[in-house]
Each structure stands twice: as structure tokens, then as C-alpha cells.
Swiss-Prot record:
Homodimer. The gene is glyA. PANTHER family: SERINE HYDROXYMETHYLTRANSFERASE, SERINE HYDROXYMETHYLTRANSFERASE 1. The record marks H225 as: Plays an important role in substrate specificity. Its cofactor is pyridoxal 5'-phosphate. It comes from Leptospira biflexa serovar Patoc (strain Patoc 1 / ATCC 23582 / Paris). This is Serine hydroxymethyltransferase.
Amino acid sequence: MSYLEKQDPEVYAALKKEDERQEHSLEMIASENFVSRPVLEAYHSTLTNKYAEGYPGKRYYNGCENADRVEELAIERAKKMFGAEYANVQPHSGAQANMAVFLATLEPGDSFLGMNLAHGGHLTHGSAVNISGKYFKPIPYGVDEKTETINYDEVAKLAKEHKPKLIVVGASAYPRVIDFNKFREIADGIGAKIMADIAHISGLVVAGEHPSPIGVCDFVTTTTHKTLRGPRGGLILSSSEHEKILNSRVFPGIQGGPLMHVIAAKAVAFGEALQPDFKTYIKQVVKNAKTLAEVFQKRGFRVVSGGTDNHIVLLDVSVKGLTGKDAADGLDHIGVTVNKNAIPFDKNPPAVASGIRLGTPALTTRGLKEKEIEAVGNLICDYLEHFGDTSFESKVKAAVKEITGAFPMNHFRLED
């Protein structure tokens, strides 16, 4: 019996069930992945007990020599991964990283360009319900109605019209390559700075499967989970000239003490991403996503933008008479985890949506390749085409169990 099970059986039971859910379901939420045992071990370390306000060598507390070393390793590895001059590993999340850059470049009420949430952007890129949309003045840009890819002409037009101080580049549901150089040209034309939020594609950037924004954009932010396979957290990258202002905007600007156990886990994950097999992994992630998109298209489903260049497949389920919510809830019932997602020019409200977003990072971590992904894609199509047929569900559930059984999880369990 573990210490946790003995002291708090209720929490233990919930965590045990989550272990089982991850083990016996197909995780296809694009923003989720599975960390390695070493990453989890670092995350579970006694650094969770240590307060370390400030930065290495400049702390406000004593006893930080080991925390300093861990953070220095994380910084060094982050810079090496991306080829950046500066890295701040302290942001608790991608949202915190984005806000730090906003506060370093904008004053309250200043305007900035950001991708429309309904077209694949992110809450922190100017949504009215987010602080980025309340504190500053967002000017949304979107995708072309026919191609469903970024409308760079619209971006240029909006930039000239509004002359924002900052242009935010990046998305949370955009399956195509982003042309950072085009954004640079637009920004240079009006004297604006650029922040690239590569939270979803950072692993692809590290592995060379997507063009890098380093040296093109002024600021780069990312989460450290998703395709990087690290703990949940944030990261800021830039040139050394912005070090002082960015550091001050993170601490003491929007955060107090850093989460040192998370930074330790980041350091381990960054070390893993620097290994040759990480490139192999990311290449497989992209191959799997392309395979998945092809299956959907062959089966008569509409894939937004006609395919994918990264790890995301955005599927329009309305062509089958379904809503995104119905499809996501139904798939969850059979052990396939996705999320409902708006598609460009969606007629349904966000809480219902017309699409689902699928990703291949977690299944690829689990070991699935094109053959298995093709089977998963067909399984999803079979279920959606027989939606509501309870007699068919048992067949699909059995197929899911067969796949998960063949590719067991490799992560800590409570009894380890």
C-alpha cells in the first residue's frame, strides 16, 4: 500500500482511475501527450518544497544553489534546442508566457493583431473573455473562406489600417505551416514587433519539421508539454537584447516564486528533445497525422483545409449530420478522447461546434505508426457513421481495447 493510498484513499482512487483511463483509451487531444518516467521523477522531486524567487545567482532566498543549477540546465538546454540567445523557463503556462510578452511590448489599450479564436487562434490572442482582450485592443485576422488557410492579404490590410504595436502569430487549431517570413514583412512595413506562439508546433520546430521563428520573430513563446513532451508549463525565447525587460515582466511582473520541480522536469524533457530519437518521434507524429487525414477523406469526411502539415487534424463532422459536441462525447464513451472544436465560419456556437480536433502526439508516443493510425481512423469513421447505434458500440469498444492492449503505456503508476 502506498503512502497516498493509506493517508488519502479518495484522492488515490481518483488518480488510480485516471491511470486506468489513460491506459485503456486512445488519447487524441492534440494538446496532450505522455511524459517519460524521468520527467515524472523530476516533477515529483523535493524541489517542490523550495521557494526561489528571482533568477539564478540573484535569488531573494538562501539555499537556492541546487535550484540555480537546475534552472541553469533548463535555460541552457532550451537555448540549444531552439538556437536562441535568451530563454526564460519560469512561466507557469503558455498563457503566462504570452502575457509577459504583452506587458513587455504594449501599454493598456494598445492594439495588436491576433488570430481569430473561431478560425483556429487561442484565447490569449485577444479573445474578449481573456485578459488579452480586456486589457488591450485586439484586431482579429482569420483564414480564407475557400482555402481555410491564413489570409496573409487580410493580415497586411489590417496591419496597415490599424498599425498595431504587436502582431501575434500562432494558433491552437491550425493544421497548416505558418509562414513567419510573411508576417515579418508585414510587421516591418508598419514598425511592429512579432510574437510567435508555437505552443502546438514547438516540438516540430525543434525537430526541423516546421520552419523556425527564431531570428525571424522578436519573441517566441511556447508551452512545454504538447509536442515537446514535457511537464505543463511555459517558455519564452528571444534575443539577448530583450532579456532584462522579459525577465522583469515574468518576475516580479506577473509571478512570484517559480515552480522549481516543474523547471526540473522541463530540463529533463529538454534534454530528451535534444536526442536524435526525438526527431524520429516527431517525423512519425507528422506521418501519423497525414495518414489520419487521408483516412477521413477517403471515408467521405471533410478535413478542414484539405489536410494537415503538422500534428493536428480538424474534422468537420457536420457533413455527417453531427455536432462537434455529440461526436466528441460519443467518441469519449467508446474510449477515444478528442475535443469538440469550432471550424472556420462555424454556424454553431463554440460550446456545440461543428468539428472535432484530433492530434497524433500521444498515440505516437505510445508507439502507433501508420498502419495502426489507419485502423484508428477507420474505427472513428465506423463509429461516427453508426452514431447512436448502441449495438455497434460494443464492437468499437472491443477494437479500442485491442489497440491499447497492444501498445501499453510507459509511465508511472501509483504502485511504482
